[in-house]
A protein has these predicted regions:
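Gram-negative/organellar outer-membrane beta-barrel architecture
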Residues: 1-177
Length: 177
């Protein structure tokens, strides 16, 4: 499971030699099928709220020849434009991963355009039973109305900034099925 969660392999199989005569020194065979170094996905579609769009997602599993994965997703549509990215270290000792992420989005409605940006720095811990994610996040949202001719519509222009400290945790206790 750890090998599969790393995202570096397309397929993992582990077999144990079942010969009872070799029980003290049983052979374990691990077969791995490595995932490609880079992967790109192109999408074309229509969103119910924002209309037609195209997207491109790119994943590099060893960016700058470092033990890190870089993921970027760009979406371009008639009313929505967005970018989301994450740089994550491969598993470190103790099964931790360091994370750095960001996002930017512009969404247009009939009355205004909303811009949002986010940056996140954190650390993740993932095992079969436990998942923990700690991160600090900064976010900014700007709302810009199209009609600023009246005092009421000009007053709807807003800027909001936030900084948060976050912790997510999952614990699983499952019977073998």
């Amino acid at each position: 499971e750890r090998l599969q969660r790393s995202g570096l392999f397309e397929g993992v199989s582990v077999t144990l030699d079942g010969d009872a005569g070799k029980a003290d020194a049983a052979a374990v065979t691990v077969r791995l099928r490595e995932a490609p170094l880079q992967q790109a996905t192109v999408g074309v579609g229509i969103s119910a709220n924002t209309g037609p769009r195209v997207s491109l997602e790119h994943l590099h599993r060893r960016i700058f020849n470092q033990c890190a994965t870089l993921r970027n997703k760009v979406e371009w549509g008639a009313k929505r434009k967005a970018w989301e990215g994450e740089l994550a270290s491969h598993a470190l000792p103790g099964l931790y991963r360091n994370l750095l992420g960001g996002a930017w989005e512009s969404v247009e409605s009939d009355t205004d355009r909303v811009y949002s940006a986010r940056v996140r720095l954190g650390r993740a811990y993932e095992t079969q039973r436990h998942e923990r994610l700690w991160f600090v996040q900064g976010e900014q949202v700007r709302v810009r109305p199209f009609d600023t001719s009246t005092a009421a519509s000009a007053g709807t222009r807003t800027d909001t900034t936030s900084a948060t400290l976050n912790f997510h945790s999952t614990w699983r206790e499952l019977d073998s099925i």
